[in-house]
UniProtKB/Swiss-Prot annotation:
Domain of life the protein comes from: Eukaryota
Protein name (database record): Serine/threonine-protein phosphatase PP2A catalytic subunit
Family indicated by similarity: Belongs to the PPP phosphatase family. PP-2A subfamily.
Annotated source species: Medicago sativa
Chain sites annotated for binding Mn(2+) 2: D89, N121, H171, H245
Xref: PROSITE patterns: SER_THR_PHOSPHATASE
One term of GO molecular function: protein serine/threonine phosphatase activity
UniProt-listed Enzyme Commission number(s): 3.1.3.16
UniProt cross-references to Pfam families, sorted A to Z: Metallophos (PF00149)
Residue numbers annotated as active site: H122
Cofactor binding annotation: Binds 2 manganese ions per subunit.
Annotated binding of Mn(2+) 1, by residue: D61, H63, D89
Length: 313
């Protein structure tokens, strides 16, 4: 078999898998294993501060709400027609973490230049054992193998992205240990999310109305004030910090005099919060538009069988 026909076969298989996943049907354990091996090769080559070109559509938390991710693609455009940047938290809380994260990883393997998937604080072994992804893998596959395959892959996800050298995108927020983007570029990200330190802060911190650094009520990361954002943006020649990590009722929320924006893309979070979701479209001229959306219509949702702790991340 020639190289071209092998590539054609792989592409055909991936297209079939994406089509299956779009119907919210999980792949087999073996397919997940092979897919994640391919994804690892792609992600290994990406930077801790992954450069992204505009136009791009920036998205926040999804949390296993598969039907709302499908709605997001209906509203924002299919990948690869639209270039996407997701800022983490694909799993936990929602009922379809397996299908959600598998679809995003499959799109990454199929269209590596058209989708960027960053790591959120939930892309971690410890957090997923408490908030649903581990249990869901056990229920859908009969063992923890798929959970292990994905949590091993999460170690390779880039931590941050930089759109056109001006918009800094990440899941959580800033760190007192990080002054420059080069500081981030220089650390080894291939590990479980630590309990403290710069890598932890990027995935856990939140903007705050108070100046300076504060102790985070989350027990990880810090709160950071407008003075911190302004200094970081100035030092690194940035126009905006885009982040996710916090439920905001309108789907987006400006802070720090429009130096920081929070984007949240899981509508009616946990199927009960009543919030809108949004995505941020950055055009060729670096202008930006928020698109808000409501939950996708649902049929036959499963009832919650076991209450997960009410701890909003």
């Amino acid at each position: 078999m020639g190289a071209n026909s092998m590539i054609a076969d792989v592409t055909h298989d991936l297209n079939e898998q994406i089509s299956q996943l779009m119907q919210c049907k999980p792949l087999s354990e073996q397919q997940v294993k092979e897919l994640c091996e391919k994804a690892k090769e792609i992600l290994m080559d990406e930077s801790n501060v992954q450069p992204v070109k505009s136009p791009v559509t920036i998205c926040g938390d999804i949390h296993g709400q598969f039907h709302d991710l499908a709605e997001l693609f209906r509203i924002g455009g299919k990948c690869p027609d639209t270039n996407y940047l997701f800022m983490g938290d694909y799993v936990d809380r929602g009922y379809y973490s397996v299908e959600t994260v598998t679809l995003l990883v499959a799109l990454k393997v199929r269209y590596p230049q058209r989708i960027t998937i960053l790591r959120g604080n939930h892309e971690s072994r410890q957090i997923t054992q408490v908030y649903g992804f581990y249990d869901e893998c056990l229920r859908k596959y009969g063992s923890a193998n798929v959970w292990k395959i994905f949590t091993d892959l999460f170690d390779f996800f880039p931590l941050t992205a930089l759109v056109e050298s001006e918009i800094f995108c990440l899941h959580g927020g800033l760190s007192p240990s990080i002054e420059t983007l080069d500081n981030i570029r220089n650390f080894d990200r291939v590990q479980e999310v630590p309990h403290e330190g710069p890598m932890c802060d990027l995935l856990w911190s939140d903007p705050d109305d108070r100046c300076g650094w504060g102790i985070s009520p989350r027990g990880a990361g810090y709160t950071f004030g407008q003075d911190i954002s302004e200094q970081f943006n100035h030092t690194n020649s940035l126009k905006l910090i885009a982040r996710a990590h916090q439920l905001v009722m309108d789907g987006f929320n400006w802070a720090h005099e429009q130096k920081v924006v929070t984007i949240f893309s899981a509508p009616n979070y946990c199927y009960r919060c009543g919030n809108m979701a949004s995505i941020l479209e950055v055009d060729d001229c670096k202008g930006h538009t928020f698109i808000q959306f409501e939950p996708a219509p649902r049929r036959g949702e499963p009832d919650v069988t076991r209450r997960t702790p009410d701890y909003f991340l």
